[in-house]
């Protein structure tokens, strides 16, 4: 086995494998191990299932260690093939379904692609999410100030503090119309809240970042530039944080948080509804 890898982990599904990945990652994060992840979506027929089984078995014979397999598969004949592999297999959905079945005294009716597939019941929600993504892309980095009143949240911050990835995550994961507005170096001599944003202050949310981290990120983009200098980063961060305090704009430091954590904190602080898809 590669010395840098403790375990190989498979996420397998007859659908997108998103559920298997999310739950599997959550479980594996509890253990101090380095993993090599393999995601295999749309395992929908026996031929594909046998190929997956062979892949699992090959890693076992190569390393001598059982791969960990998190799977979500509806058809029993497909599940049976995966279960015959040399992997340590965990049915992530059935582990929750069985006790719920007993509690609710109802038999489940498994349907492939129900979790992330389109159907007449969720088509409107899907269309709303696509509209949110379109809106967010059109209002990224201050590209357009038109229709800002339609935003559910407007993220503020210096360049490279995480505004764009957070906005896109909010749109894609939760269907939130998220605009973002950058404060650039030229703004810093007299930093004030732009007139176009003042009527929308209840929608504003600020991001900040440790200057050292900001300098490192900017250095990768513009090496040895004033833009990436620690002095410049310290000045910009200090000015922006002062603006947040003066205008009573809620804000968080993004340095030690993932995009998922930042987005969730924004939803919580701003009281925005979580719309899962």
Curated annotation (Swiss-Prot):
<keyword id="KW-0418">Kinase</keyword>
<dbReference type="GO" id="GO:0004674">
    <property type="term" value="F:protein serine/threonine kinase activity"/>
</dbReference>
<dbReference type="InterPro" id="IPR005177">
    <property type="entry name" value="Kinase-pyrophosphorylase"/>
</dbReference>
<dbReference type="Pfam" id="PF03618">
    <property type="entry name" value="Kinase-PPPase"/>
</dbReference>
<comment type="similarity">
    <text>Belongs to the pyruvate, phosphate/water dikinase regulatory protein family. PSRP subfamily.</text>
</comment>
<protein>
    <recommendedName>
        <fullName>Phosphoenolpyruvate synthase regulatory protein</fullName>
        <ecNumber>2.7.11.33</ecNumber>
        <ecNumber>2.7.4.28</ecNumber>
    </recommendedName>
</protein>
<dbReference type="GO" id="GO:0043531">
    <property type="term" value="F:ADP binding"/>
</dbReference>
<comment type="function">
    <text>Bifunctional serine/threonine kinase and phosphorylase involved in the regulation of the phosphoenolpyruvate synthase (PEPS) by catalyzing its phosphorylation/dephosphorylation.</text>
</comment>
<keyword id="KW-0547">Nucleotide-binding</keyword>
<dbReference type="InterPro" id="IPR026530">
    <property type="entry name" value="PSRP"/>
</dbReference>
<keyword id="KW-0808">Transferase</keyword>
<keyword id="KW-0723">Serine/threonine-protein kinase</keyword>
<dbReference type="GO" id="GO:0005524">
    <property type="term" value="F:ATP binding"/>
</dbReference>
<feature type="binding site">
    <location>
        <begin position="157"/>
        <end position="164"/>
    </location>
    <ligand>
        <name>ADP</name>
    </ligand>
</feature>
<dbReference type="GO" id="GO:0016776">
    <property type="term" value="F:phosphotransferase activity, phosphate group as acceptor"/>
</dbReference>
């Amino acid at each position: 086995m590669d010395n840098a890898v403790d375990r190989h982990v498979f996420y397998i599904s007859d659908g997108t494998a998103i559920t298997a990945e999310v739950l599997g990652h959550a479980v594996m994060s509890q253990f101090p191990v380095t993993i090599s992840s393999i995601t295999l979506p749309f395992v929908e027929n026996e031929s594909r299932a046998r190929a997956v089984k062979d892949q699992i078995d090959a890693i076992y014979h190569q390393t001598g260690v059982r791969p960990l397999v998190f799977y979500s598969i509806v058809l029993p004949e497909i599940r049976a093939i995966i279960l015959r592999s040399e992997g340590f297999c965990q049915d992530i959905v059935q582990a929750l379904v069985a006790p719920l079945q007993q509690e609710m005294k109802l038999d489940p009716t498994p349907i492939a692609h129900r979790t992330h597939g389109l159907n007449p019941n969720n088509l409107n929600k899907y269309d709303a999410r696509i509209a949110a993504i379109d809106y967010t892309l059109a209002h990224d980095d201050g590209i357009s100030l038109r229709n800002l009143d339609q935003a559910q949240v407007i993220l503020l911050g210096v360049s490279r503090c995480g505004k764009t990835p957070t906005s896109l995550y909010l749109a894609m994961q939760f269907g939130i119309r998220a605009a973002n507005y950058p404060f650039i170096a030229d703004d810093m001599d007299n930093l004030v809240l732009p007139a176009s944003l003042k009527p929308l202050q209840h929608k504003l949310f600020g991001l900040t970042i440790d200057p050292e981290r900001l300098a490192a990120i900017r250095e990768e983009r513009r090496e040895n530039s004033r833009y990436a200098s620690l002095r410049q980063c310290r000045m910009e961060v200090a000015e922006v944080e002062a603006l947040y305090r003066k205008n009573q704009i809620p804000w968080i430091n993004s340095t030690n948080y993932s995009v998922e954590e930042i987005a969730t904190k924004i939803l919580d602080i701003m009281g925005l509804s979580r719309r899962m898809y």
